[in-house]
Design a protein with these regions (language model features):
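Conserved ABC ATPase "signature" region
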Residues: 27-35, 126, 130, 137-155
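Conserved catalytic motifs of ABC-family nucleotide-binding domains
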Residues: 180
């Protein structure tokens, strides 16, 4: 869901986070020197990032490990204070108005949980509803709707520690939305999930963005998440914002080839021009769905060469 001209739900200006870490020297003398002198160096996790996210946007925030994605999310949500720069969420500073901002945002970290480990899942929901002062009628409506959309009914009475990764992630997403936030931050919500669990999470996120107008910022290493969910992509590397635009522009700027000629050590029988090569993406109602990655444009069995033409958009997904 993209709203042209909508007010900014999230604003970052010159956002910078610098960590000061100790410098370790080898040997006994190095340890003594570190103990006495306390030598340090600065590590720039995020180095001057600026962007706006409009209300109702679904934005992907991608980059390699250590690029600064999670640090950015933590500053946007008030978990970390920026070294310098400004952050606003719905016009409020997460650092100065923590309670007000907390009422308006939901946060999910794929490798952590806000659920109580030894309690049944339903108890965690009830505790969170009380913490956010959710009215009983709103809570019942939430439970009815989200139990159906996320399939929570099968494990509501199960302790969180006994949930599968897919079940826990669905429960964590529901918990982040229990107080009807206007902005949702998702840090790798599909990490470690199987194909079916990922599809269920993606479908749910699409619905709440489309039907409720929830603004979503998603970090992920799965390009399928970006392709299916996000109209806009931001790329961060070494703490710097390297790209901000749509997926098609990102693929074009990456310089992916559109054609390729291969010389093979041996030729498989049956290769013909016009044949498409692809992969199975999942099981649909009518059978297996397949996404073509490339088309054979020429075959020469004498020279043992095959020419391929790629679909750049589909070839970009893992």
């Amino acid at each position: 869901m993209s709203i042209v001209g909508a007010a900014a739900a999230v604003t970052a200006r010159g956002l910078r986070k610098v960590y000061r870490v100790g410098v370790r020297r080898p040997g006994l003398w190095g340890s003594i020197r570190q103990l006495v002198a306390g030598e340090t160096r600065d590590v720039i996790a995020v180095g001057g990032v600026s962007f706006d996210i409009s209300q109702g946007e679904f934005v992907g925030y991608i980059g390699p490990n250590g690029a600064g994605k999670s640090t950015t999310v933590k500053m946007l949500t008030g978990i970390l204070h920026p070294t310098c720069g400004q952050v606003q969420v719905n016009g409020l500073s997460p650092a100065r108005a923590r309670r007000q901002v907390a009422q308006q945002i939901g946060v999910v970290f794929g490798q952590r949980t806000q659920l109580w480990w030894d309690l049944p899942t339903i108890d965690s929901f009830e505790i969170l509803a009380a913490m956010y002062d959710v009215a009983p009628a709103d809570y019942r409506r939430f439970m009815d709707e989200f139990t159906e959309l996320l399939g929570l009914g099968e494990f509501l009475d199960t302790p969180v520690r006994r949930l599968s990764l897919g079940q826990r992630m669905r429960a964590d997403i529901a918990a982040a939305l229990i107080h009807a936030p206007r902005v949702l931050f998702l840090d790798e919500p599909t990490i470690g999930l199987d194909v079916m669990a990922k599809a269920q999470v993606r479908d749910f996120l699409t619905r709440i963005n489309r039907d409720r107008g929830v603004t979503i910022l998603l970090t992920t290493h799965d390009m399928r998440d970006i392709e299916e969910l996000c109209e806009r992509v931001m790329v961060i590397n070494h703490g710097k914002l390297m790209f901000d635009g749509n997926l098609e522009s990102l693929i074009a700027s990456a310089g992916l080839p559109t054609t390729m000629s291969l010389r093979l050590s041996s030729m498989a029988p049956g290769l013909v021009a016009g044949q498409t090569l692809g992969r199975t993406l999942g099981q649909a109602q009518g059978g297996a769905q397949e996404s073509a990655l490339c088309t054979i444009t020429a075959v020469d069995y004498t020279a043992r060469t095959v020419d391929l033409a790629f679909d750049r958009r589909k070839a970009s997904a893992p």
